[in-house]
Amino acid sequence: MKRILVSILLCLSLASPAVCGPRRAIILRAQFKDVKFEMDEAQAKALADSASAYFTEQLATTVTFDLGPVITLPQDMSYYGHNSTLRRDELIYKAVMETCLASVDAVDFARYDADADGVADNVLLLTAGVSEAEDAGDDAIWPQMNYLNEWSAAFALDGRKIDCFSVSTESAGLRTLCHEYAHSLGLMDLYDTDGSASGGLAPGLWGTLSLMDKGLRTGDGSLPPNFSAVELDVLGEGTCELAAPGLHRLEPMGSSRRYLKIPTDVDGEYFLIECRAARGWDADLGCSGLIIYHVDRSSNPTGYSNYYKKDLTAAERWYYNQVNCRPDAECVHVVAALPTATSAAEIPFPQPGINNLDAETNQAFRYRDGIPVPYVLTNISTKSDGSVSFEISEPLKLLEVDVFQDAAILNWEVAGAIGQDVECEVAWCRDIEKIHTSGKAKGHTYTIEGLTPGANYMAIVSATTKDGHSYSVRTDFTTRTYREGSRPYILIPASQRNADGSFKPWARLPLRVANAPDAVSVRWSDGTNEIKAGDDGHFILTGNCTLRAEITNKDGSRDVIIKEVTIR
């Protein structure tokens, strides 16, 4: 059945993001020679109206689902729903085409082209009977989104190309209908689409938090859950705010569509924070509170794909609709309040005795490479109106990283909330190395010596409190390269000088010499007295002086560099 799934996945990857502004969708109804609708007209209209209400709320724009006439197709259900070794529902495209052609007198397909590109946005086919996904047999219809072009069968009606289509069944309910239509907006499946392959069954979003997960299978199928921060982020919808230290309050997604994002240094990898309340469309959610997602749509490697027989990046998994196929490399997963959670009720914050989140107590609050998120969430509490309040702090913050050819100076601060009596350590390694070198820091500064020019490095600063609690922050940098044929010179940061070359008052100099690969020591003076860098690795200029660097090389020779310093 591999080829069947692959065909559907490739089609999903072609779907376009949602179009801003009002839009219409058409629900065409098809029954078969041997299977007729049990749903009456009033029930069908209620389904269309509910779909309209749902997407209008989720997209914050008017979405209207129109109802087409009931069309009786000339063949039995098995004719259209039969599976081959190459494709599921091998002739479903004929059901779509025949229903469209039979509905043309009652339906103006030109109304369903929101972006006026000459192509109908989607045709939603609602079929009679029970679906194959509900164990109705291999010849029953499988809910899906696909393209007629997959069969080279796209055609035109009312001046519009008919290509993209979704299929649901009368038994599947509103939730499945909305799920399949949402694929046409550009949303991917967030459950494990290859089942137990690729390393086992991944939890996805716990089968409840997302319309695109197995949330469509909870309750009686009548309540699709609200779009989560993940769906809104993918579609560019809702209000996304960057997380920052301070007090925060988030209202339930069903009423505000506002969420926070914690970015990372890796483009496409980030965390999303939202509030959910088990009411309205989320009544079947099974939980309420603060939900945190780790999203990866980057070029990070995510392991082997059993379907594509190759390693995939996170971005490729989104393209191929294999977002959460590997339990050890999910591209969207929930940072559960209880790391050992076995039910949706144990996912959100707060939980009894758990109203804080940091990377030490919850390993899921780390980037894919294992580096801790620098933020800590504390005092998480739910309010009577369903909202959640909490505080974000940054216990350990890098203030600056000065990079040279053979060294780097790191300066950081420790938040008063964790106390100043902490022990700090710095660990670093080149990008081609696996073993870290580390050193204890005196205070909140550290100079890494002996680095290779023109090399990429990663450094991690860790602060450990008296009670053993640890916080970390990471930085990546590239050391400066040597200038071939250039004499040694005093390295002076441009930020410390004025446009005319003079120095700013209280300028901070790192007292480093560049292009001196053979130097074994450097003695610094201000023309009168020997000077040394302070605790932060810098020397502060307090007045005009003659800056002098006396270099002793490996062969015993000496170089002297003099720089006249004028402060303005």
Where are these regions (language model features)?
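Solvent-exposed segments in extracellular or luminal domains encompassing
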Residues: 448, 537-545
